[in-house]
A protein has these predicted regions:
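Conserved catalytic core of the tyrosine transesterase superfamily
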Residues: 1-271
């Protein structure tokens, strides 16, 4: 079995389990790194001791953060448990990366108001949903039209942290702007359909079970991009959601304009 085929297996398994694209990319990166670290030996030939050596190398020689080391461990455990279906024995004798003891950065109410005044749509609505609904940045970006419930004033967050669904509030002051965003997506979708497109990326299992649903309006992303792009999985031209870097850049720019000098990010809206 070649390395290429192994990584293809990893990607396929991740997609069956509905993990995010960022998790897929991260896991493949660490698995590839792990294999190369051990001289390109197939993981089936390696043991828990080899995993310990790799994790220790990351902490001692690469000086990675604890979260980074844990991500590498999760990727390798996933490889053995889910892909190779040969769980490792207990992994011990690992030098753990040191955890930072930083106090979480928090925006004051006045800072939030300043930030909002320096944000334009659709980024203002995005920030509002993260702040008022407690959404993580990728949870917000992956919202579909069907996830918004105006009657109950709620938002369904699909496959959030831990791959779990949950319901959160839709703040009253955001309802009008959410409706405007949905109207925009509906207009874009009509144009896409007229041009012979209109598909959106679907969760793996649903895409196979309901192939026609990919063109349904209710599955379209709330924060759709201005232009279509080629989906890396299906190779079809689709309309994806706005990139994470776009909202991150908008928030950083708004912080600069507002004179807020904190090591903050989109995640700070949740604190």
């Amino acid at each position: 079995m070649s390395k290429v085929r192994l990584l293809d297996q990893v990607r396929q398994t991740i997609r069956v389990l509905h993990y995010s694209r960022s998790t897929e990319d991260a896991y493949c990166y660490w698995i590839r790194f792990y294999i190369r670290f051990h001289g390109c030996h197939h993981p089936i030939e390696l043991s828990a001791a080899h995993v310990s050596q790799f994790l220790t190398f990351l902490a001692v020689h690469r000086n990675v953060a604890a979260a980074t080391q844990n991500q590498a461990l999760n990727a390798i455990v996933f490889l053995y448990n889910r892909v190779l279906q040969q769980p490792l024995e207990h992994i011990d004798n690992v030098i753990r990366a040191k955890r930072s003891r930083r106090i979480p950065v928090v925006f004051t109410r006045s800072e939030v108001q300043l930030l909002f005044r320096n944000l334009k749509q659709p980024y203002l609505l995005m920030a509002g949903l993260m702040y008022g609904g407690g959404l993580r940045v990728m949870e917000m970006l992956r919202l579909r039209l069907k996830d918004i419930d105006f009657e109950r004033k709620s938002i369904l967050v699909r496959a959030g942290k831990g791959n779990k669904d949950r319901v959160t509030i839709l703040p009253d002051n955001l309802i009008e702007n959410v409706q405007h965003a949905m109207d925009r997506v509906a207009a874009i979708h009509r144009q896409d359909l007229a041009e012979g497109y209109g598909e959106v990326q679907m969760p793996y299992a649903l895409a196979r079970k309901y192939p026609n649903e990919a063109q349904s309006l209710h599955w379209q992303f709330l924060f759709a991009t201005a232009h279509r792009s080629t989906d890396p999985v299906s190779k079809k031209e689709m309309r994806h959601h706005i990139f994470e870097t776009s909202i991150q850049r908008a928030v950083k720019t708004a912080m600069h304009r507002a004179g807020i000098h904190k090591p903050a990010s989109c995640h700070t809206f949740r604190h």
